[in-house]
């Protein structure tokens, strides 16, 4: 299988998002990379499902709470930016203060 560097990055992010999702389901608190991966993965999948940038920006703030992540993680993540493929092209989705 031949993948472009961008496709490899997306695959790595998706894999990290799955790991984070499973750890969260087991009741573990997520660390910084896991929290970013989970939110980013959900945003990419939402774009694939046909949601708008505005919907994804709004939903991105509701995916995790401070109780679901390790201490200090919400303060470390001020912005998450994900480049997503939409039916009308590639767009950058920015989520400000994603964990409240």
Curated annotation (Swiss-Prot):
Record-annotated membrane-spanning stretches: none
Induction summary: The probable operon is induced by urea.
Pathway: Nitrogen metabolism; urea degradation; CO(2) and NH(3) from urea (urease route): step 1/1
Source organism superkingdom: Bacteria
Main location: cytoplasm
Keyword Metal-binding set for record: no
GO MF term list: nickel cation binding; urease activity
InterPro entries assigned: Urease_gamma (IPR012010), Urease_gamma/gamma-beta_su (IPR002026), Urease_gamma_sf (IPR036463), Urease_subunit (IPR050069)
GO cellular component, one term: cytoplasm
Catalytic activity: urea + 2 H2O + H(+) = hydrogencarbonate + 2 NH4(+)
EC number: 3.5.1.5
Entry keywords, A to Z: Cytoplasm, Hydrolase, Plasmid
Top EC class for this record: hydrolase
Compartments in which it is found: Cytoplasm
Family statement: Belongs to the urease gamma subunit family.
This protein's name: Urease subunit gamma
